[in-house]
């Protein structure tokens, strides 16, 4: 995952602008500056997530990361609900924020990976030059962290220009989302805009 200032800060800023475009008092330049300051804590969150094995079906790691995500969402002020992603291991996590606007947004990404148990211990998160490495660093724990830190910056700015802002973290995307596709479809139908934080193929 590239960690040059511009890709990370631009991604966070664009994530913020998706919502802040609804509010005239949030200037893009100011958001970019805040996003630049958020790079270090963002990478710390990525490291925390990457260093736990969450291969699809690996219940201990999925449970640990699920607890962390629930804690982080609640700290940001979300109303949080979890439900088993049966027949998959792990929980679907839904965090909901209520605002003063009219439009609804869904932010979604998975927190499982394709890696075997023990991979995180063998090659933990590291930064070399302008790249970060580790199991799931791009697909998609970087996206999980992107959502959390975008929400933090919105909260810091006291921005509530949305009607409903919903976050969905699912634990089984890498094997087809058997235990989460239903809730994904249901939530998508309920929102005006849906943002997936899955990385592009290239």
Give short role names for the model-derived ranges.
Residues 11-12, 41, 117, 142, ...:
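Enrichment for repetitive, rod-forming helical segments
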Residues 4-5, 135, 141, 152:
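Basic side chains
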Residues 140-202:
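Acidic/histidine-rich catalytic neighborhood of metal-dependent amide-processing enzymes
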Residues 18-20:
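N-terminal signal peptide c-region/cleavage motif recognized by signal peptidases
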Residues 25-135, 155-162:
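Acidic/His- and Gly-rich active-site-bordering loop/insert found
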Residues 2-11:
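Bacterial N-terminal signal peptides that target proteins for export
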